[in-house]
Amino acid sequence: MSDPVIKIAHNLYRVPTMGSGINSFFITEADGSITLIDTGLKTAPKKLVAAIKYLKKDPSDIKRVLFTHSHDDHAGGAAKIIEIIGSPKVYAHEAEAQYLESGKNPPRDLTHLAGFFFRFTPEGKFNPIKVTDKLIDKQVLPIGGGLQVIHTPGHTPGHVSYLHQESKTLITGDSVFNFGFKIAWSLSAFCTNFNQSKETALKFLDLDFDTAAFTHGPHIQKGGKQKLKKFLT
């Protein structure tokens, strides 16, 4: 059995909640507090709690919950894990907060055939949560030695990626996936504006990072920027 957490840097961990197919992330602080990035599906809280205990921590040590965006594979476990934690601060981009607070998915891109076709399929649902702190592009949070917010809209209106400056790790969210054997775009069927998603991912080329971490797929410990650059260009 694989470990419930995978260390990326001394204070940054990847938490596979459905194998490497869906990941959350922990950032630990010297004061013992933890930041959680994305909460996975509704079934994920059990895995998140197990991961916390594996690190010899308590769920109440999670003081901040950050989101890349509001789809159910990122926010499905939010209400439950927040209930377990207590009253953490909850962060999302200012253009994404409305979806988290309503429990509704952002609109789909009907200009692409996949989005047009899938508009009739049921969307994953999640219980609404209260966003306490609204993020903006280029904001640097005092988390883990500096966590920069990169607004990468397109997958959703308020989709963000995060740059963990201390370890030079980019957390892409759903801007791009890593299937292990190749890097790929997110599925157009689940984007609000697929073309915009591809355009805003080019922001990654101007960032200083070596490790690339993905919500969907294993992280690339070394040479992550080079591999992303090859894909993006």
Report the location of each language-model feature:
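Residues at alpha-helix caps and immediate loop-helix transition turns in enzyme cores, especially N-
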Residues: 47, 77, 224-227
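Short acidic, glycine/proline-enriched helix-loop-strand junctions
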Residues: 88, 221-233
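Conserved beta-strand hairpin/beta-sheet module of binuclear metal-dependent hydrolase folds
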Residues: 2-55, 161-173, 178
